């Protein structure tokens, strides 16, 4: 009887240790996933805030101006690679909601495409438009009207900068919308997985 009791006690202790260890592993995994979800939201919110600031300070005043292509100044180069979402850490969401991951990927592609559009326009503005203006000023060229100005700037410079400016407006509006959608979708999924945890999300700021 004594041996049986000892065996049962040992077995009970082993089972307790097993379940405790499994609890610790699960608890550690949950903490990692919660931190990843919160960090991802932080990146989405930060990207959104950057675009809102850029739009307010730079784009909004030129939105309905047909001369925005030449009047809107160039921006300083932007990267924000430090705000890039790490999708490797979000792999666990595949079994939860693959659609959410797709929304996140679309939002990320849109954000960095917007930055690329801003940088591309600014580079062309600095490398081609500004030198052309400088040359015309050196030659004391006068402009009769807006149409004359476009003609003397040159068709290639005008068309390229006009299209690049239009792309900037399109990208910033689309990216703001997609980041908002991705953030709200991720927030809903995060609360579904961890209902007792708190998660941030993008709030309207336009």
What are these regions (language model features)?
Residues 1-28:
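Membrane-embedded hydrophobic alpha-helical segments
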Residues 23-45:
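Juxtamembrane membrane-water interface segments immediately C-terminal to a transmembrane helix
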Residues 41, 45-206:
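Interfacial alpha-helical end/capping and short helix-turn segments at domain and membrane boundaries
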């Amino acid at each position: 009887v004594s041996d049986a009791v000892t065996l049962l006690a040992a077995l009970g202790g082993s089972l307790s240790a097993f379940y405790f260890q499994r609890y610790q592993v699960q608890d550690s995994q949950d903490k990692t996933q919660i931190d990843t979800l919160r960090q991802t939201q932080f990146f989405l919110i930060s990207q959104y805030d950057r675009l809102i600031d850029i739009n307010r300070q730079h784009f909004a005043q030129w939105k309905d101006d047909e001369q925005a292509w030449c009047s809107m100044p160039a921006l300083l180069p932007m990267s924000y690679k430090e705000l890039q979402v790490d999708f490797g850490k979000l792999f666990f969401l595949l079994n939860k909601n693959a659609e959410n991951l797709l929304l996140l990927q679309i939002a990320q592609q849109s954000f960095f495409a917007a930055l690329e559009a801003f940088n591309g326009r600014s580079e062309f503005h600095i490398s081609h438009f500004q030198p052309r203006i400088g040359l015309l000023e050196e030659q004391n060229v006068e402009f009769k009207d807006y149409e004359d100005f476009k003609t003397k700037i040159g068709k290639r410079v005008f068309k390229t900068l006009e299209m690049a400016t239009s792309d900037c407006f399109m990208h910033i509006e689309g990216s703001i919308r997609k980041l908002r959608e991705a953030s709200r979708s991720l927030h809903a999924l995060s609360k579904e997985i961890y209902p007792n945890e708190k998660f941030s999300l993008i709030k309207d700021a336009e």
